[in-house]
């Protein structure tokens, strides 16, 4: 990842940019206003009733904890990647794969022995749940992500060891949950700009299609289409505080995009999706006080 001081040419000088580049910047700045409004506005929500799936038991310093893994078609599915592709991402500590899930509030329950315990309901997409039923790998991954999500959200410290209940699909009663009913607006599909006026020439590197969207108020995601590549070998990625630079092997691709948001380059991660031939970039955003 590049330091922002390394990526600091004077892109603000419109006299040094071509007409297409200026249009490129104007589209981004216009979309930035929509994003800022989305960050400050309270998102619309809808109420869902998750369906039971399976229940796992673990514990914290305060006693037994049960996690009801539930599902709902209203939860968006994760990206369609194979287990081999996902395993490669995890082995390389990449953050190109996310499992959308809804983390419910804690509710007090009684276990099989009549002793007090705490239960949490965690909902994932119904179609993804069906896929997870046939995969021990996905099941363990979902439980791990759910446990870590509950720890972050509620300040818990849960035992990473857990076991799945054999004869109960949930503990207690599964409550309704509120989820965002609208996706946040995409910034801009930058690849829709006229390719004939792209930053390169017909004999130079191709500028790939770039898609950006705000996944959460503090997380910007990018997808870069690289159909001529079979993997990440030779691919160069540099991320500054407000800039994304990508270079391909044999000078096949070059992208130099200014983003009207402040990126935490140190925490950014990327993964190459072999089947879709896309580079997926996860970029946490800096707060105003950073």
Swiss-Prot record:
Any one Gene Ontology cellular component term annotated for this protein: RPAP3/R2TP/prefoldin-like complex
GO BP annotations, alphabetical order: box C/D snoRNP assembly; chromatin remodeling; epithelial cell differentiation; positive regulation of glucose mediated signaling pathway; positive regulation of TORC1 signaling; positive regulation of transcription of nucleolar large rRNA by RNA polymerase I; snoRNA localization; TORC1 complex assembly
UniProt entry keywords in alphabetical sequence: Nucleus, Phosphoprotein, Transcription, Transcription regulation
Record-annotated site: Interacts with TELO2: 57, 64, 113
One Pfam family here: PIH1_CS
Subcellular localization, as worded in the UniProt entry: Nucleus
InterPro entries named among the record's database cross-references: PIH1/Kintoun_subfamily, PIH1_N, PIH1D1/2/3_CS-like
Modified residues (Phosphoserine): 12, 16, 173
Annotated GO MF terms: ATPase binding; histone binding; histone reader activity; phosphoprotein binding; protein kinase binding
Subunit structure comment from the entry: Component of the R2TP complex composed at least of RUVBL1, RUVBL2, RPAP3 and PIHD1. Component of the PAQosome complex which is responsible for the biogenesis of several protein complexes and which consists of R2TP complex members RUVBL1, RUVBL2, RPAP3 and PIH1D1, URI complex members PFDN2, PFDN6, PDRG1, UXT and URI1 as well as ASDURF, POLR2E and DNAAF10/WDR92. Interacts with phosphorylated TELO2. Mediates interaction of TELO2 with the R2TP complex. Interacts with phosphorylated ECD, EFTUD2/SNRP116, RPB1 and UBR5 and with RPB1 in a phosphorylation-independent manner.
Family stated for the protein in its record: Belongs to the PIH1 family.
Its job: Involved in the assembly of C/D box small nucleolar ribonucleoprotein (snoRNP) particles. Recruits the SWI/SNF complex to the core promoter of rRNA genes and enhances pre-rRNA transcription. Mediates interaction of TELO2 with the R2TP complex which is necessary for the stability of MTOR and SMG1. Positively regulates the assembly and activity of the mTORC1 complex.
Record remark on domains: The N-terminal region is required for binding to phosphorylated substrates while the C-terminal region binds to the other R2TP complex components.
Name this polypeptide is given: PIH1 domain-containing protein 1
């Amino acid at each position: 990842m590049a330091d922002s001081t390394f990526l600091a040419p004077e892109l603000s000088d419109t006299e040094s940019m071509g007409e297409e580049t200026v249009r490129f910047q104007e589209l981004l700045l216009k979309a930035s206003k929509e994003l800022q409004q989305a960050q400050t506005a309270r998102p619309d929500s809808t109420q869902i009733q998750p369906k039971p799936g399976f229940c796992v038991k673990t514990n914290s310093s305060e006693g037994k904890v049960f996690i009801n893994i539930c599902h709902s078609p209203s939860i968006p599915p994760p990206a369609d990647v194979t287990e081999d592709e996902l395993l490669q991402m995890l082995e390389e500590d990449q953050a190109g794969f996310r499992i959308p899930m809804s983390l419910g509030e804690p509710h007090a329950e009684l276990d099989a022995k009549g002793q007090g315990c705490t239960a949490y309901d965690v909902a994932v997409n119904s179609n993804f749940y069906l896929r997870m039923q046939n995969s021990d790998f996905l099941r363990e991954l979902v439980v791990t992500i759910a446990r870590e999500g509950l720890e972050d959200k509620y300040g818990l410290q849960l035992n990473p060891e857990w076991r799945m209940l054999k004869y109960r699909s949930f503990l207690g009663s599964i409550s309704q949950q509120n989820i965002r009913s609208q996706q946040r607006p995409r910034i801009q599909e930058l690849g829709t700009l006229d390719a004939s006026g792209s930053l390169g020439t017909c004999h130079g590197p191709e500028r790939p299609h770039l898609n950006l969207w705000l996944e959460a108020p503090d997380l910007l995601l990018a997808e870069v289409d690289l159909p001529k590549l079979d993997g990440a070998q030779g691919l160069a990625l540099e991320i500054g505080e407000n800039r994304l630079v990508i270079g391909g092997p044999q000078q096949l691709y070059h992208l130099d995009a200014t983003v009207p948001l402040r990126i935490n380059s140190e925490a950014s991660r990327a993964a190459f999706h072999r089947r879709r031939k896309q580079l997926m970039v996860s970029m946490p955003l800096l707060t105003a006080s950073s």
